[in-house]
């Protein structure tokens, strides 16, 4: 049995020439205390942001609109097999700061064992930065901001998760 990533529509999810001034926080099934830590962190730095919560639902067109104008995003997500909201952000060339998971038991409300997992299954250094523990938030955030212009997440998506490379792996 082989598993294959579903391709990202990089034609649909591509950057435009919008000025990149927005910040977003994407939350999906992580503990509310972790969410509050990130919100407090952003507030303490006087950073305005848009929040998208998977469980509380959001309108995709609002998310896409922010992605087109986002200078970076922060992901607070449980485990993902692929994570299309993350894939869309990266296809829009938005660098991400990810509070990654180690175990499926980190999903808030889930009843999983300590099965190894990740929030970002398809990732490399061009996509942004990630960390595992709350005490790493500030230093990892500072790294992301100090090197923000160097990230190329869209290039990673074009090379690995656009239609063509996914199709080639099927053959």
Provide a role label for each language-model segment:
Residues 1-2:
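Active-site-proximal region of nucleotide-activated glycan assembly enzymes
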Residues 37, 62, 69, 136-143, ...:
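Alpha-helical elements of Rossmann-like donor-binding domains used by nucleotide-donor carbohydrate transfer enzymes
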Residues 68-81:
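Acidic donor-binding loop of glycosyltransferase active sites
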Residues 59-70, 91:
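Short acidic alpha-helix that forms the nucleotide-activated donor recognition element
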Residues 6-63:
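Conserved catalytic-core segment of nucleotide-activated headgroup transferases in glycan assembly
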Residues 81-160:
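Catalytic binding pocket for nucleotide-activated donors in carbohydrate/polymer assembly enzymes
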